[in-house]
Amino acid sequence: MPSALINVPAKAKRGDIIEIKTLMSHIMETGYRHTASGDVVPRDIITSFTCRFNGAEIFRADLYPAIAANPFLTFFTTVTESGKFEFEWIGDKGFSETASASITVE
C-alpha cells in the first residue's frame, strides 16, 4: 500500500526560502521488464506530482519510467503567510494519493 513521507518545516519567517521533501512508497514498474516466461510486466508508475499552497499550485512534476522506485522529490519555495501545503500523486491503474502539511509563518 503506497504511503507518503513529507518533510515541511513547522515554522518559518516571512520571506524565508524553505525546502520541501517528499517520498512516496511506490514500485514504479517501468513496463520494460519481462517475466521468466517472457511476458511483459505491465507498467505501473506515478505519472505526475503536484504541490499546492493555500490552493495555488507552486510545483508540478511529470514523472516517467526512468524514475526509480519510491520517488523522492525535493524543491524550494518562499513563504509569505501561514497555510497548508497539499500534495498529490497521480499514476497508472487509477493510482491517486494525497497528503498535506501546514506551516506557520512568523
Where are the regions that the model predicts?
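Contiguous segments within soluble domain cores/interaction surfaces
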Residues: 5-10, 14-63, 68
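Short, aromatic- and glycine-rich surface loops/edge beta-strands on solvent-exposed regions
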Residues: 83-91
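Extracellular Ig-like/FN3 beta-sandwich strand-entry sites
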Residues: 17, 80-84
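Short acidic/polar inter-strand loop motif in beta-rich domains
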Residues: 91-99
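Proline/serine/threonine-rich low-complexity linkers at boundaries of modular beta-sandwich domains
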Residues: 1-2
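Short strand-edge motifs at loop-to-beta-strand transitions and within beta-strands
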Residues: 71-75
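Short beta-strand edge segments in extracellular beta-sheet folds
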Residues: 102-106
